[in-house]
């Protein structure tokens, strides 16, 4: 008789779509974690690329990951499916072109263990590819989150956070599903905690989803959905949110080349248009 399967402490969940060789780096980073009480759950979101499919087959055959294959529905739906199939009480999403520092789980898991009021643990993020530097994430607070996405998707959170937030919204196919998720989580009263060290890496390459999502039409549609969904939250925190927006715009204005591409500007313009529409209706 085989021994009963134990429940891991952490489920790393990964949506994959035609990631190619970037996937290999992400898989290695999970295997290199010093925190060993974990599992890796992958949802292949309809990949057609032979390299991607071969790497996933190898990961499944070796026992490094459980792989679930589905038709292409976008990363939000893929993450939701992965969490449904995951067994652990703690969840950490990892995109296939990003990776983790070896001590990421070792440094973040104890924070959730120590304080049940903390629902999300985020870390500083190393930027690679088209941008280089360090993203000092946070704060995980509603006014700041209304101004921009202050937390990277590769943050550790409790499964209960995902349940109470309603999961990742599959309407956000192009991007911002993480931003929406963090807003929903904060609205439920969850606190965040930042580990001020680079423990996750975000790679933005020429084929990255975020690059495509910054096209004006896609960005405007996404912001309209985000603002409409969280309108009540915005109204309750209007004064503080405007203060956070002001700070963001002042920081962005130091680089005029980037100001109109800044998420805070897009959000402010979308909110303005929606408010103008409301005034015309009254």
Cite the ranges covered by each PLM segment:
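A conserved hydrophobic helix/loop-capping motif in glycosyltransferases and polysaccharide synthases
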Residues: 9-22, 26, 33, 43
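Acidic donor-binding segment of Leloir-type glycosyltransferases
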Residues: 27-69
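Glycine-rich, basic loop-to-helix element that forms the pyrophosphate-binding segment
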Residues: 70-86
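Short aromatic/hydrophobic "clamp" motif used to bind/position activated sugar donors
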Residues: 91
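Conserved donor NDP-sugar-binding/catalytic core segment of glycosyltransferases
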Residues: 103-134
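Nucleotide-sugar-dependent glycosyltransferase catalytic core
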Residues: 136, 142-143, 172-174, 190, ...
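Acidic donor-binding loop at a coil-to-helix junction in glycosyltransferase catalytic cores
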Residues: 174-181
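Boundary detector for helix-to-coil junctions that initiate low-complexity/charged tails
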Residues: 217-282
């Amino acid at each position: 008789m085989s021994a009963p399967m134990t429940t891991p402490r952490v489920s790393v969940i990964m949506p994959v779509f035609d990631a190619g060789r970037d996937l290999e780096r992400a898989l290695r980073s999970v295997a290199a974690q010093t925190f060993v009480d974990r599992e890796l759950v992958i949802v292949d979101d309809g990949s057609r690329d032979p390299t991607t499919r071969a790497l996933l087959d190898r990961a499944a055959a070796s026992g490094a990951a459980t792989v679930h294959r589905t038709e292409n529905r976008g990363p939000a739906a893929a993450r939701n499916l992965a969490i449904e199939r995951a067994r652990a009480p703690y969840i950490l999403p990892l995109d296939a072109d990003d990776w983790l520092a070896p001590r990421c789980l070792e440094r973040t898991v104890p924070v959730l263990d120590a304080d049940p009021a903390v629902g999300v643990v985020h870390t500083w993020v190393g930027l690679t590819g088209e941008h280089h530097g360090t993203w000092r994430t946070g704060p995980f607070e509603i006014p700041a989150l209304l101004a921009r996405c202050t937390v990277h998707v590769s943050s550790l959170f409790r499964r209960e956070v995902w349940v109470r937030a309603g999961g990742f919204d599959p309407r956000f196919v192009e991007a911002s599903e993480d931003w929406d998720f963090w807003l929903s989580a904060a609205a439920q009263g969850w606190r965040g905690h930042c580990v001020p060290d680079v423990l996750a890496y975000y790679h933005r390459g020429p084929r990255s989803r975020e690059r495509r999502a910054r096209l004006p039409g896609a960005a405007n549609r996404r912001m309209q959905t985000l603002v409409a969904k969280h309108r009540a939250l915005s109204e309750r925190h209007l004064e503080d949110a405007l203060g956070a927006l002001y700070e963001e715009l002042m920081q962005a204005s130091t680089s005029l080349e980037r100001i109109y591409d800044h998420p805070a500007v897009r959000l402010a313009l979308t909110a303005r248009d929606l408010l103008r529409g409301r005034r015309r209706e009254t």
